[in-house]
């Protein structure tokens, strides 16, 4: 009898826990994805803050030349970063217990792997939590689909690219100047600016900014005034009101006359789908581009210069880009390589005559 009561009590305790986890009445929805998201993101955030402030220099290139990234070792907010895991570790899973000591783990950049792997798991769970909450509320699933774009971009630079290049040391450093360094080296080695998928990403980000500004300004300019001239127009809106808050016909008429009639949406649902889809698809393509360049399927290169009938080079923009790429390539990891890869891979000229 006692055992039966205990089992019922434990079952009801588990049931209450399940109800609490999946309740949409909580101030912040937790959900089953949140059960994994909360500890992983807390771990990533905590280790990032500690490492950004106090981590010792990391031997990123595996050549016994540690690079300082933390504030206590001479950096500021701009130059500071979590230095990627050493090339000596490569793609090996490198938790603390795999190192001989904590000092060795820090020297080889263990915190970078810890932060990145927990972060990626956390943001993937955040995406799942968005879907889960939408499902509980009877909403459509497109919020999570839109969030998949930045998740794909993060996975591309923190996981797919290191896998393709063979080492976590090639991942993006976790800092401002480290991000710019990653971009410059990426351009030098993969000519990303000449990759069509990156071009689509640029169109997505800049186009999305333009469309967002256009939409916000059009709506704000065509509000239906419910207040006097002495009050803010914003005070005329009541949360949850059934009436339209702006005149879409006026906005459509304005924009149709500013550009031409069919450049303006007359369907609010089509408009908002477009506003969501444009940047999301662009960022999807950029993430796909990074993931293919990870395996050295690079952007267009025009290594053969245009020459005239006399064999003289006619300089084009491609020649300028090639020269810039070589300059950036010889300057990065300058003590790890004697020559940039583009020069070192060329067959040596014959000396036999």
Curated annotation (Swiss-Prot):
UniProt site (Tyrosine radical intermediate): 161
Q: Where is this protein localized, as stated in its record?
A: Plastid, Chloroplast thylakoid membrane
Per the similarity annotation, which family is this?
Answer: Belongs to the reaction center PufL/M/PsbA/D family.
Major location category of this protein: plastid
Reaction(s) catalysed by this chain, per the record, are: 2 a plastoquinone + 4 hnu + 2 H2O = 2 a plastoquinol + O2
Q: Which gene encodes it?
A: psbA
Where, by residue number, does chlorophyll a ChlzD1 bind? 118
The identity of this protein, by name, is: Photosystem II protein D1
Q: Where are the transmembrane segments?
A: 29-46, 118-133, 142-156, 197-218, 274-288
User: Taxonomic lineage per UniProt?
Assistant: Eukaryota, Viridiplantae, Streptophyta, Embryophyta, Tracheophyta
Q: How is it modified after translation?
A: Tyr-161 forms a radical intermediate that is referred to as redox-active TyrZ, YZ or Y-Z.
- Tell me which residues are marked as the site Cleavage: 344-345
């Amino acid at each position: 009898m006692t055992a039966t009561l205990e089992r019922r009590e434990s079952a009801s305790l588990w049931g209450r826990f399940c109800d609490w986890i999946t309740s949409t009445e909580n101030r912040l929805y937790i959900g089953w994805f949140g059960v994994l998201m909360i500890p992983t993101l807390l771990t990533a955030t905590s280790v990032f803050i500690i490492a950004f402030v106090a981590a010792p220099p990391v031997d990123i290139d595996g050549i016994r030349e540690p690079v300082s990234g933390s504030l206590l070792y001479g950096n500021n907010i701009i130059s500071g970063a979590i230095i990627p895991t050493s090339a000596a570790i490569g793609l090996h899973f490198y938790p603390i217990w795999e190192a001989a000591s904590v000092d060795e783990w820090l020297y080889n950049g263990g915190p970078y792997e810890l932060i990145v792997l927990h972060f990626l798991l956390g943001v993937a769970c955040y995406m799942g939590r968005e879907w889960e909450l939408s499902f509980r509320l009877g909403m459509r699933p497109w919020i999570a689909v839109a969030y998949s774009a930045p998740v794909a971009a993060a996975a591309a630079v923190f996981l797919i690219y290191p896998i393709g290049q063979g080492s976590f040391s090639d991942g993006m450093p976790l800092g401002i100047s480290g991000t710019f360094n990653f971009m410059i080296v990426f351009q030098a080695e993969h000519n990303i600016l000449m990759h069509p998928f990156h071009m689509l990403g640029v169109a997505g980000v800049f186009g999305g900014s333009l469309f967002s500004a256009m939409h916000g300004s059009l709506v704000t300019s065509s509000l239906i005034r419910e207040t006097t001239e002495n009050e803010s127009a914003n005070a005329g809106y009541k949360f949850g009101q059934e009436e339209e808050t702006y005149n879409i016909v006026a906005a459509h008429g304005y924009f149709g006359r500013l550009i031409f009639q069919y450049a303006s949406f007359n369907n609010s649902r089509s408009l908002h789908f477009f506003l969501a889809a444009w940047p999301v698809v662009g960022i999807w393509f950029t993430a796909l581009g990074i993931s293919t360049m990870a395996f050295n399927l690079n952007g267009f290169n025009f290594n053969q210069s245009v020459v005239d009938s006399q064999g003289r080079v006619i300089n084009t923009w491609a020649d300028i880009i090639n020269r810039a790429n070589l300059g950036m390539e010889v300057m990065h990891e300058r003590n790890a390589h004697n020559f940039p890869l583009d020069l070192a891979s060329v067959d040596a000229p014959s000396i036999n005559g």
